[in-house]
Amino acid sequence: MKFKKILLSLLICLSCFVQAKNITISRLTCEMQEGLVVVEGSPRLGWVMESPENGTRQSAYEIDIREAFTGRSIWNSGKVYSSQSQLVSTKGADIRPDNSFNYSWRVRVWDETDTPSEWSSEAKFRAVPERLSSGQWIGAITRQNAHLPEGRKFHGGELKKPEVKAAWEAVDTLAKKSICLRRTFQVGDAKEGGANRKPGKKIVEATAYVCGLGFYEFSLNGKKVGNSEFAPLWSDYDKTVYYNTYDVTEQLRRGENVVGILLGNGFYNVQGGRYRKLQISFGPPTLLFELVINYEDGTCTTVHSDNNWKYDFSPVTFNCIYGGEDYDARREQKGWNQIGFDDSHWRPVVIQEAPKGILRPQMAAPVKIMERYDIQKVTKLNADQVASASVSTKRTVDPSAFVLDMGQNLAGFPEITVRGKRGQKVTLIVAEALTEEGACNQRQTGRQHYYEYTLKGEGDETWHPRFSYYGFRYIQVEGAVLKGQKNPQKLPVLKNIQSCFVYNSAKKVSTFESSNRIFNAAHRLIGKAVRSNMQSVFTDCPHREKLGWLEQVHLNGPGLLYNYDLTAYAPQIMQNMADAQHSNGAMPTTAPEYVIFEGPGMDAFAESPEWGGSLVIFPFMYYETYGDDSLIKKYYPNMRRYVDYLKTRADKGILSFGLGDWYDYGDFRAGFSRNTPVPLVATAHYYMTVMYLVQAAKMVGNDFDIRYYTSLAQEIMVAFNKCFLHKDTAQYGTGSQCSNALPLFLQMTQDADEQDNYRPDADLNEKVFANLIKDVEAHGNRLTTGDVGNRYLIQTLARNGEHELIYKMFNHEEAPGYGFQLKFGATTLTEQWDPRQGSSWNHFMMGQIDEWFFNSLVGIRPSTTPKQGYQKFIIAPQPVGDLKYVKASYETLYGTINVDWTCENGTFTLNVSVPVNTTAVVYLPGGKEPKEIQSGTYQLVCAK
């Protein structure tokens, strides 16, 4: 495509008045988060600015921090001449953990003409409470009395051993029961329970800190606080325990109040009972609670977890993160979490052992019910189908069974509204696939997992599980009929049923649309799979394993960062990785590491450089996106320990362990890498982690490490080329796509000169790249890479301008490709390119094309200058194939970038919006020189 004559036209007229450019401050953040943020030490603040005029930028700012209630001044920055508007330091501010009040802050800015804006609205934050970690943990039984087995080896064949079975069967059944806890307290008295009460004191702030393990539901005076599911986010409880912070000022009333907590097992206490991937217990369900109430007169009262609480069994009679959930509504105690309830028959709690992990505030967004889906199709199973399905599903299918197609594969649970007689039961079996008979099929995803609801018989009853979820599209209902259906057996009537799509509520920050149907649908397919697996961690699948496999964190990292606000989620992922790191520096393949893979054939699953490398690689992706180097600096010691560990495993610079290019493609069932040698992939990632560590050493200012690891990287690169490069053919390894793409991507195509010094070899690079293209073309413009190689193949082609080839590789409806999955009827990305081969139908590990959609088709990329984090960025769209248009938006820390281009009738038209206080470097297709534009809205036109 050749373009000539560039026309640049402004869409926004310049103001004719000499005045302030009407800068308004629209979004205040603390540690890049909105709302009430809990901080350790002096926080970093940020703000987004808007202006109706082009070219607006900040020249100075002033920050004012006060105590929210009293208005007492804490810190003022004065006028600071700087364009920085994100991650602005407040070092020197007296933020004290013993202060129970919130802090408020505001900011004003000056534009490039030194004209000030109005003060912004106020935002709040509060310090991490220093006394919370000394609180008491309460529950129904201590770990010691529960006789819970210890260790992380309980999976697979280990669970079948008689001694292991006996150990788990010896556990006190009380240790896995869901319980309700309650406590009454007074509000409005100068001294709670004291003789000199002063009624009528006004509450100015009330903050609750809650940690209920494994999961909890928190209520005040009978009403649920917040709308999260599966709180707190799960972790390695021996290392880190998260608690949640709630502003409950409006929920309290003067006089008597009641706090209620419902506890479930979660990943804290996986004891099995039905399907389970593993078993592990950190202890029986437990609660840590603290409520701090500040009054207008300056006094403060605290309600905390202690032996004044009571508990009883909840209506949740079974709950397992892997196996499902049962609920007996007959066991509900009306008003149990409200004033006036008689709890004389409830039991006193016991003081339990605290989890070993460090208490940390949960900064990442909670998991919530984010979407709901209604019935799309109903199928009643006949007698023959019921009989046959009872064999194929290995469970007795009730003759009343019918199957609902909800239209969307997702992670979550059903919600029902049902009416029937007391004691009647409704069973819900969920699955993402169907058997030949049309019944729900969990063979590939872990069986048995189901939900059972026992009615109380009091009108309409609405219920959904609280402590378990699964991946499913279909719901098999047994023991009920749908409203309007014949009901000769007088079964309960389902008046409504929905699929609840449950995932992390981290903000979606982008949109993408093109004129290509397959690309649009592939983007949606990947998005649904990502959301299904974006829970407390990035899981591999929402049913069979629910484990945080680490390779997808960096291999899909750019795509994830283009689509979601990971400012708080990513630091938690890093904490999980640091917690999972072994004492010798080794990194497991999963974090949290709930199971240690041991035994014959399991070594590759225990640790693999492509998986563990996320510890080193992902912080740099975070830094490029947000301009925040804190993760690199915080986890530098962990990165170094991991690289040092890999060095101990290397033989003359070559690593020979791991999973390699997992699930690569060919005329075989996907699994272990077949096309590309495992040592090649492992060693390339070893080199990559060392190169990133060198960059990290420069950022932390460690000169010794810079020299040492630069030398190590050179040694690895030399060993790699000596071992895998075939000079006569300019092929690496087997000559597979992954074999050649990896060294090209990492710029390892080097050769020795006459003095035996290795230097970049342009001729070699060109020949290897030509071989890569030949292989893609020889396979009919199809890939042969897998989970690991996909990104390197796509991005190597893109970096070298082969966008037309990438377009051909994915603009079709054959396997391997997204179009084939769409043609098959998939609604989430599947584990294998050909879903008919089995395995999970809800994996996002093959979703690397999303990065290309944004950094190439749309053309938005962070700048390569030191100004990371999109204060300066690139827009370089690539019109390819028969694309007529692409339009997208991407919300950065500084505001939203909009890109909308069309290519019609020989003219390429690009419309862009650049946020205030940022600069875009625009490359037009075919143009030689970029154009640098400041904030505002522009149209750029190229005539063919």
Predicted regions and their residues:
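Sec-dependent signal peptide recognition
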Residues: 2-9
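Hydrophobic h-region of N-terminal signal peptides that target proteins for export
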Residues: 11-19
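Extracellular/oxidizing-compartment recognition motifs
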Residues: 23-544, 551-552, 568, 584, ...
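Alpha-helical support elements that line or immediately flank enzyme active sites
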Residues: 206-210, 220, 413-432, 475-480, ...
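Active-site acid/base region of carbohydrate-active enzymes
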Residues: 215, 286, 304-308, 312-313, ...
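Helix-terminus loop motifs that line ligand-binding clefts
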Residues: 223-232, 236-238, 436-448, 567-672, ...
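C-terminal capping/lid segments that line or modulate ligand- or cofactor-binding pockets
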Residues: 259, 327-328, 545, 563, ...
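Non-catalytic C-terminal accessory modules of carbohydrate-active enzymes
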Residues: 279, 286-290, 303-336, 340, ...
